[in-house]
Amino acid sequence: VIIPPKGGHGFNAVQELGAFFVMTNTSLEGTESANSGDVSVANDFRKVCLIKDPKSGGSAANAATLRATKAIRLTGISGTFAVDEKITQSSTGAVGKVVEFDSTNSILYYVQTRHNDEGVDSNGNQTAFSGANVVTGTGGAQGTPETSHSATTNNVVFVSGYSVPEIDHDSGDVLYVENRAPITRAADQTEN
């Protein structure tokens, strides 16, 4: 005869199992295009994080995947923007770094950092890319933001040619961080 604990087995799993740790496992499959295309194969990655309660637009984020990059829909493109290339908008003083360039949809995905105080105003605030001002890469590529484009393209929502990240920066609690050697992705690749 097995005598269950008060409330039955599974009533209080933490107490019954004596658990203090949780193990998780996930797989990154190709570009995840069946979901949203948020997992790019255009760039390598070195860090995997688990974030508790991230926000999206000030509310709880509930999507399966979220893109943390900003994006610009370009027109009149000359040249090709390269991954990790510095981009600038001289008329505004904005500076960024290319994460991915989707030449099919004319979308430039980028991030802005404060590591070297480039692209910040006198108060230390980042200067945003804005308007129909030409964006130039250090390799010579150029494009003009398509400010008349306010639509969803490739699962990215644009307003006047610009898209904000789907996750609010500095939101949520970092529960786990794993630093890895650089992993270069491919469309037919799965990481565990």
Task: Go through the PLM ranges and name each one.
Residues V1-N192:
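Interface-prone segments of viral and bacterial extracellular assemblies
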